[in-house]
């Protein structure tokens, strides 16, 4: 194996990259410079740029037709350049609640720990598809989420930049300004987390479970305790009741559970803080991917039974009568007739 250091200080397997780019070039007839633009991204893109790539955004940035961009990443997956992920994204906070390598592993119901909310997934709502560089071609730090810093884990691994506030700022960027403390805690460990509390409220959050505390902060509430004990244990958070006034306070946090946690304390502007409604930048929905012929050709095992138990919100019903279908089966055989019927429906889908 030949390894080279790229300009962005990334280790690339040059032999595999070249072989797989050749396979991608041969997959179909591409528009000029489409594959070279992808190669440039693979060689010189940052770790963030190669993680959960949105092919619709890539198309816009590189002046490529959306359909060709989707085909590009699908064929790149077949060639082994990228891995494809199906993600359940919370509509309230843009948290990637769950991520799957296969559509078959998706389920209909999901729970967002950050919002304490439950949702039902649909292929055209909450389910998006992204692409991440294969670790066999180039290693990026997001391939090992357990080794990420607490900051990277929350703001790049957990939250997607696709959720945008009414003023156009990504929610993940706005949320960074609320964080006062953010740390990883191993099982059995303890940490004294000091916060300079302001009017509003303090939210303590384990980013992988429902464990949290919510403490209003207001003037005239009495003496603020210098230390507030907090215990995290198996998805639960136990903390002493405290009257918090503006000023410095130390939270004595102990992870009594058996798993590591990423724990943070956020300063909310008011005790009744309501997160603004998000809208999402265009992305590749599960429904659109399933309607893409390249996906149906290259990932046939994913298509079979793909929509079992998964809703589609926007549906058009078409009633079609196949005249003489029984005679067709008898004349040319079951398999050939089945293929003809499938082509009939494919023509309808493509219309």
Question: Which role does the model predict for each range below?
Answer:
Residues 191, 225-248, 254:
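Noncatalytic accessory or regulatory domains flanking protease catalytic cores in secreted, cell-surface
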Residues 302, 306-351:
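Catalytic NTP-binding/metal-coordinating core of nucleotidyl cyclase/transferase enzymes
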């Amino acid at each position: 194996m030949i390894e080279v250091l790229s300009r962005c200080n990334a280790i690339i397997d040059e032999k595999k990259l070249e072989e797989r780019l050749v396979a991608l070039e041969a997959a179909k007839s591409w528009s000029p410079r489409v594959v070279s633009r992808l190669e440039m991204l693979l060689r010189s893109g940052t770790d963030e740029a190669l993680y959960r790539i949105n092919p619709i955004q890539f198309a816009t940035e590189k002046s490529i037709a959306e359909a060709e961009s989707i085909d590009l990443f699908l064929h790149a997956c077949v060639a082994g350049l990228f891995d494809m992920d199906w993600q359940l994204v919370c509509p309230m906070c843009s948290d990637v609640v769950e991520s799957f390598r296969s559509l078959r592993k998706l389920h209909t119901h999901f729970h967002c720990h950050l919002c304490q909310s439950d949702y039902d997934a649909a292929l055209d709502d909450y389910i998006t598809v992204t692409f991440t560089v294969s670790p066999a071609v180039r290693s990026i730090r997001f391939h090992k989420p357990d080794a990420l810093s607490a900051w990277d884990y929350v703001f790049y691994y957990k939250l997607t930049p696709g959720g945008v506030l009414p003023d156009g700022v990504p929610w993940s960027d706005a949320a960074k300004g609320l964080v006062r403390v953010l740390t990883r805690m191993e099982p059995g460990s303890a940490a004294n987390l000091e916060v300079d509390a302001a009017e509003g409220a303090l939210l303590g959050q384990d980013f992988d479970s429902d464990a949290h505390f919510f403490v209003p902060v207001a003037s005239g509430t009495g003496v603020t305790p210098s230390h507030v004990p907090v215990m995290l244990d198996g998805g639960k958070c136990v903390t002493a009741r405290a009257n918090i006034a503006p000023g410095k306070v130390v939270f004595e946090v102990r992870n009594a559970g058996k798993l590591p946690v990423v724990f943070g304390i956020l300063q909310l502007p008011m005790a009744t803080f309501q997160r603004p409604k998000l809208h999402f930048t265009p992305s590749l929905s599960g429904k659109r991917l399933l309607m893409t012929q390249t996906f149906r050709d290259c990932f046939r095992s994913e298509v079979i039974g793909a929509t079992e138990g998964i809703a589609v919100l926007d549906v058009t019903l078409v009633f079609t009568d196949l005249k003489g279908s029984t005679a067709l089966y008898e004349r040319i055989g079951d398999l050939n007739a089945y293929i003809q019927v499938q082509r009939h429906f494919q023509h309808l889908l493509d219309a």
